[in-house]
Amino acid sequence: MFDFDATLPVMALQFILLAVILNGIFYTPLNKALDERADYIRQKETDEKERLAKAKELAQEYEKQLADARKQSQEVIAAAQADAQKIAAEALAKAQKEAQAKKEEAAVEIAQQRQAALGVLEQQVDVLSRQILEKLLGPELVK
């Protein structure tokens, strides 16, 4: 069926020689190119992971700074509101004090004017009463 002559070893030798030549000419440069490409991809992936980590870190720092700025602005606003309320309360107290003083002044003045008016009215009543009595009783009886 099969003849085992020199053809089989020659073909095996040719196959091995072809494999060695292809390995040297084709497979080694191809493997080298594939390895270089894989290294390049791994390097880029590592670089991108580092950039992503740095970007996340910067974003966290930015968020922290933003939160601090918001907190400070809220504190400033609260302090300004407290100052404004204090100033408004002082102004209101001053205005109320001035109004109370003017009210008391007006009350004293009204009381004085009332006393003066009552005094004048009393004198006029006395004069009118005397005149009425004189007319009714006559000037000789009224003294």
Swiss-Prot record:
A GO cellular component term found in this entry reads: proton-transporting ATP synthase complex
Q: What is this protein called?
A: ATP synthase subunit b'
Q: Which GO terms describe its molecular function?
A: proton-transporting ATP synthase activity, rotational mechanism; proton-transporting ATPase activity, rotational mechanism
Q: Which CDD domains match?
A: ATP-synt_Fo_b (cd06503)
What lineage is this protein's organism placed in? Bacteria, Bacillati, Cyanobacteriota, Cyanophyceae, Oscillatoriophycideae
**Protein purpose:** F(1)F(0) ATP synthase produces ATP from ADP in the presence of a proton or sodium gradient. F-type ATPases consist of two structural domains, F(1) containing the extramembraneous catalytic core and F(0) containing the membrane proton channel, linked together by a central stalk and a peripheral stalk. During catalysis, ATP synthesis in the catalytic domain of F(1) is coupled via a rotary mechanism of the central stalk subunits to proton translocation. Component of the F(0) channel, it forms part of the peripheral stalk, linking F(1) to F(0). The b'-subunit is a diverged and duplicated form of b found in plants and photosynthetic bacteria.
Q: Origin, by domain of life? A: Bacteria
Q: Which SUPFAM superfamilies match?
A: F1F0 ATP synthase subunit B, membrane domain (SSF81573)
Record-linked Pfam families: ATP-synt_B
UniProt organism field? Rippkaea orientalis (strain PCC 8801 / RF-1) (Cyanothece sp. (strain PCC 8801))
Family (UniProt): Belongs to the ATPase B chain family.
UniProtKB keywords: ATP synthesis, CF(0), Hydrogen ion transport, Ion transport, Membrane, Thylakoid, Transmembrane, Transmembrane helix, Transport
